[in-house]
């Protein structure tokens, strides 16, 4: 289960700025884990685009589980 602060990777292109394979951090979980607010970052650690994007669970994969 993907939760806040976990690191994810997209498994498809989200928009013109967020390509397949882009990494991000989960900021918020919506609708019992069906949607997520993600801060996406580039290879330099810089925020991509407007800083946040809402994505569907099917469009992301868990990369790093952050222990609480």
Task: List each model region and its residues.
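Basic/aromatic-rich interaction segments and small domains that mediate binding to polyanionic partners
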Residues: 3-62
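Long, low-complexity intrinsically disordered regions
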Residues: 63-68
């Amino acid at each position: 289960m993907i939760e806040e602060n976990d690191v994810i990777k997209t498994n498809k292109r989200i928009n013109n700025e967020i390509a397949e394979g882009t990494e991000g951090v989960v900021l918020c979980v919506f609708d019992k884990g069906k949607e997520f607010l993600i801060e996406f970052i580039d290879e330099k650690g810089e925020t991509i685009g407007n800083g946040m994007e809402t994505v569907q669970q099917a469009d992301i994969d868990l990369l790093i589980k952050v222990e609480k």
